Amino acid sequence: MTSFSHLSRLRMSAFLPHVCLQCRLKTVSSLPAQSSASSLLQAVRHASSARPRRRTPSRMTLSPNVAQSTVKYGEKRKSVRHQNGPFGGMNQRRANLRDRQRPRSQAELKRTSFKKDKDGSEKKQPELFKALKMQTALSSVSYGRRTSIKSKISNITSFDQFDLLPSVRQSVYDSALPGLEYVTPTPIQRLAIPAILRQGSATPKPEEGQEDMPRFDQYLLAAETGSGKTLAYLLPVVDAIKRTEAKDKEEEERMAKEELEKEQEQAKEKNQNLFELESPGEEEEPINAPKSVVKPKAIILVPTSELVEQIGRIVKQLAHTVKYRSALLASNYTPRKIRKTLFNPNGLDILVTTPYLVASIAEANPYIFSRVTHLVVDEADSLFDKSFSPKTNTIIDRTAPTLKQLILCSATIPRSLDNRLRERFPQIRRLVTPNLHAIPRRVQLGVVDIDKEPYRGRRHLACADAIWSIGRSGNPYDADVGYQVTGQKEPKSIIVFVNERETAAEVAEFLVTKGINAVSLTRDTSEKRQAQILAEFTTEKNPPQPEDYKMLKGNRSDDDSVPFVNVRPGNERSNRLSNTKVLVVTDLGSRGIDTVAVKTVILYDVPHSTIDFIHRLGRLGRMGRRGRGIVLVGKKDRKDVVREVREAMYRGQALI
């Protein structure tokens, strides 16, 4: 009998393959020891009805959160958003509180970052700026720090808020930025000018074992291109020179007064002792003695002679209002002009030059660094690379005994420069703007695929077609008011950047054959020719005034005729682009040149790094102006890098 019951239990478990294990065990254990076949079948029929006990409905359970209010006192409760359907919102197990967001776990966030492909498989979303991160060369700045800097400088809206001398402050309006109705400092000027004016606050006192550390203040000015970095360091330097000059003048007056009193006392003693011999006085300097070299108080170092001319122009402009002596030294100057500058009997306050030239002068005249109190290293990323760093470091070491402030300035901070500054100047104060390593959003970037029709890989033809399209196009509403009134064509200046020096001459020659006024600028170009070419792209011509329109109207033969504005010419089509000038250049023209007259830049070759992207496109959007960039891409170019640069520009993010 026992064996029969055991056998029946085994058969019963075989009949329940689709019933859960718990129900199966309950059914089998509830069977009697002696069972017939009919009772077994009846048990199988009702086995699926065996379920665990249902939980108590919510309407029969007291809420433990009665005292917990989800609405503040005095506020109205938000209306509940009903679900679609006749029974929507019924029997919900979770409260749908839309006023607060449910915290999500890391696993859930990771799952939501995946998206499904067409075949239903999960596909990982590509990492943002992956191509730029793979070839990153710039030192990043956290966005939290960028936000804090924005809030810090938001209260400064005028140059009058800076503790500058009245003459220095007035020179901004009269000399540096004349003719502007509203003059406000840029972000780097709001950061740098107050910091540099507080002398002695940037370098703490050396601790034990750090007596060999530099005693002068150290600053790093890092800001985007075209943001006014030159005025940011030049105004505090000029202010310090004028304050020191005033103190020296007071000291000279005091010394002269003491000397006069001393002479009067000696005269009284001489009258009392008439028979004593006079002591030999100091020997006078012979007339034919060699002249001493000038001893500037501030030196501004730049990498190229073009930058010497540009920054020297600003230094000379400020000197019209603030009286000081300045000079420029570059390799394209004649030996006679250099000698005249070095041995000027009137002295010198500010010297703008290149590291190699001033270092070679110091070998023969070491006293040129004896009075330097301010040293500015502009374009620091270039002056601290392998080619310039030995001379730059030598100049810093030789000026260190009398130096008060060292100012480094750059638009890009590579990781190599960042590491070198942390080793050499660990106490340097970093003044970084929120938009560092970012191209302004007012600059638009277009991409031309040269592999498509009608170019078929001919990069020269794509460049010429883009220039012709820009030269012939133009909305009169985008032009200056003077050109709208007189109907004249607005002159256009375009810069074409190439990677190789040989390519520049080839591209310029091809563009000339297509009726485009194009010239090339490389190291092979003579210094005089370089100055003439850059003058056309760095100086902006004033637009025609309404008086010119009146003069044109008065010269008409028919006084009753109606003047038409921007009348299109006939069907005659010229083979030359008369109102457009093109400059084909290498990276020689991408560093610091203030190309205010340029509104379009064409990247003939894709730049090698994001640093070149920033400097080349940085020729646009200067001082709040708009600009347009065009990059030509082919089969062998990194299209993913160009795409991410364009996306970063649209987002206003830094090119990491």
Curated annotation (Swiss-Prot):
Its EC number is 3.6.4.13. Keywords: ATP-binding, Helicase, Hydrolase, Mitochondrion, Nucleotide-binding, RNA-binding, Transit peptide. Residues 60-71 have a biased composition (Polar residues). Residues 480-656 form the Helicase C-terminal domain. Residues 42-125, 246-270 are annotated as: Disordered. It catalyses: ATP + H2O = ADP + phosphate + H(+). One of its GO terms (molecular function) is ATP hydrolysis activity. Residues 1-46 form a transit peptide. It comes from the Eukaryota. Residues 210-431 form the Helicase ATP-binding domain. Belongs to the DEAD box helicase family. MRH4 subfamily. ATP-binding RNA helicase involved in mitochondrial RNA metabolism. Required for maintenance of mitochondrial DNA. The Q motif is unique to and characteristic of the DEAD box family of RNA helicases and controls ATP binding and hydrolysis. This is ATP-dependent RNA helicase MRH4, mitochondrial. It comes from Coccidioides immitis (strain RS). The gene is MRH4.
